[in-house]
């Protein structure tokens, strides 16, 4: 019983460490879209291209896209 608990714990820790390292790598890859050089317009253009109608801003050295835009209700036909 103790061996299975230890194995389960080690798998859980390994999964957590892998997830944290993957997230850090992802954030590092997003680091530069103009925010590192102080050119926010590059970030804004990127966000507008990915999410039409959204805006972009820099937080730290990362480009963040604000997609909290209310959607229009669908038009009623008929």
UniProtKB/Swiss-Prot annotation:
- Principal location: secreted
Q: Which UniProt keywords apply?
A: Antibiotic, Antimicrobial, Cleavage on pair of basic residues, Cytolysis, Defensin, Disulfide bond, Fungicide, Hemolysis, Immunity, Innate immunity, Secreted, Signal
The reply on keyword Acetylation is: no
Its domain of life? Eukaryota
Example GO BP: innate immune response
A Gene Ontology cellular-component term? extracellular region
Query: Pro-segment residues?
Result: 23-29
Q: Which residues form the signal peptide?
A: 1-22
Q: Where in the cell is it found?
A: Secreted
Q: Does the keyword Secreted apply?
A: yes
Report, as the record phrases it, the tissue specificity of this protein: Salivary glands (at protein level).
Q: Which residues form a coiled coil?
A: none
List the cysteine pairs that form cystine. 35-58, 43-63, 47-65
**Function description:** Has antibacterial activity against the Gram-positive bacteria S.aureus ATCC2592 (MIC=0.8 ug/ml), S.aureus 6A (MIC=0.8 ug/ml) and S.aureus 15A (MIC=1.6 ug/ml), and against the Gram-negative bacteria E.coli ATCC 25922 (MIC=3.2 ug/ml), E.coli 23A (MIC=6.4 ug/ml), E.coli 27A (MIC=6.4 ug/ml), P.aeruginosa 3A (MIC=3.2 ug/ml), P.aeruginosa 7A (MIC=0.8 ug/ml) and H.pylori NCTC11637 (MIC=6.4 ug/ml). Has antifungal activity against C.albidus ATCC2002 (MIC=25.6 ug/ml). Very low hemolytic activity against rabbit erythrocytes.
What is the similarity comment for this entry? Belongs to the invertebrate defensin family. Type 2 subfamily.
The name this protein goes by in its record: Longicornsin
Q: Which organism is it from?
A: Haemaphysalis longicornis
Gene (UniProt): sGDLP
